[in-house]
């Protein structure tokens, strides 16, 4: 298992990828129809009318459509639509046959878009909670600098004691190795040790 900082970096990279995929999906599959303006903001209507509207899902697009730059990098709804059930398969095949290959993807229906939007939001929240957890288990997150320095000194002392024990064991191992070498030398010369059990 990787250390906490590596896990944290991986989660941050995944969160950035999820942000990109979410924005790509939202910009690609939203129909860009104007929202209902809030009653307290009367100037919102002219701003909303400036947003270009994607063609509706039922209307086939003409051959003059251009590629959408974010469409290739964004999530496509094919796997989710195919997994939705066999009843949607003929309808999806018919829609894909009507649409030219170079046309941008059609916007999702409002219900599908809302469902996927919630799923993407849930995934972002889960990833953010993973990041918060990893940050909370980092050492020293709840201690002062002086406490951290004291802990470092304690760990250094423990390390010194363990290193001394390791050195003593190494010296003992070396001594026992020399003793075994001496016994093997005596056996090879045939003096001092008999082979009878």
Swiss-Prot record:
Residues 140-183 form a coiled coil. GO terms for cellular component: mediator complex. Pfam families: Med21. Residues 60-70, 90-100 have a biased composition (Low complexity). GO terms for molecular function: transcription coregulator activity. The keyword Transcription regulation applies. It is found in: Nucleus. Residues 37-112 are annotated as: Disordered. GO terms for biological process: regulation of transcription by RNA polymerase II. The keyword Lipid metabolism does not apply. Keywords: Activator, Coiled coil, Nucleus, Transcription, Transcription regulation. Signal peptide: none annotated. Component of the Mediator complex. Belongs to the Mediator complex subunit 21 family. Component of the Mediator complex, a coactivator involved in the regulated transcription of nearly all RNA polymerase II-dependent genes. Mediator functions as a bridge to convey information from gene-specific regulatory proteins to the basal RNA polymerase II transcription machinery. Mediator is recruited to promoters by direct interactions with regulatory proteins and serves as a scaffold for the assembly of a functional preinitiation complex with RNA polymerase II and the general transcription factors. This is Mediator of RNA polymerase II transcription subunit 21. The gene is SRB7.
